[in-house]
């Protein structure tokens, strides 16, 4: 993540966590997005609760994936925002005080680890140990640039259009991006043939 725009996941632990990260990145909403932007833990103990309406696109898809509770914790060292740690479970319920304290310690340790790994990287480059997860999103950045040119809009607007297309067509964002890069999907301005 950088600035005010989530940049994607660097690490997931299983297929469900990978799906949750793809949903957040693709939809632009979810616990990690909010934890990063708000710089505060975001705790949702029951995604299926009628009181849980903060993520109208993310929540139903996360529930379909078997996730019932999600918890996002910012990764920040001093004033440096690094990203967010996402925890989930398949049963609803809040974190206990001990679990919450452990998650805060874990987020701090992950943040320190990222800084240590990044310390030896050349300026402007990502540490080799962190590159694996970043590779998954290069295609999306390339597709955003292509759509930006196709529509004559900013890259940020192009990413919004890609996300909207993926959501409307019930396709993973990465699949849509791969189609754009492969030139099997082209975005056209209103009134253009494409």
Protein language model regions, located:
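Short hydrophobic alpha-helical segments used for membrane anchoring or interfacial signaling
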Residues: 1-5
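Short hydrophobic/aromatic beta-strand element in the GNAT-like acyltransferase core
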Residues: 55, 59, 72, 84
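Regulatory sensory and allosteric helical modules in signal-transduction proteins
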Residues: 9-10, 17-54, 60-68
């Amino acid at each position: 993540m950088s600035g005010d725009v989530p940049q994607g996941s660097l690490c997931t632990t299983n297929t469900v966590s990978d799906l949750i990260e793809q949903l957040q990145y693709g939809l632009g909403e979810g616990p990690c997005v909010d934890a990063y932007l708000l710089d505060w833990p975001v705790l949702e103990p029951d995604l299926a609760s009628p009181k849980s309406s903060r993520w109208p696109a993310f929540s139903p898809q996360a529930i379909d994936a078997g996730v019932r509770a999600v918890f996002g914790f910012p990764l920040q060292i001093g004033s440096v925002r690094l990203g967010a740690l996402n925890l989930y479970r398949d049963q609803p319920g809040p974190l206990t005080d001990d679990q919450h304290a452990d998650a805060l310690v874990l987020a701090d340790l992950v943040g320190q680890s990222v800084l240590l790994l990044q310390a030896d990287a050349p300026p402007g480059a990502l540490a080799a140990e962190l590159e694996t997860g970043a590779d998954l999103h290069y295609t999306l950045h390339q597709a955003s640039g292509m759509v930006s040119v196709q529509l004559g809009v900013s890259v940020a607007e192009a990413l919004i259009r890609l996300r909207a297309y993926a959501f409307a067509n019930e396709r993973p964002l990465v699949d849509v991006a791969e189609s754009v890069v492969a030139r099997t999907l082209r975005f056209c301005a209103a009134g253009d043939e494409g």
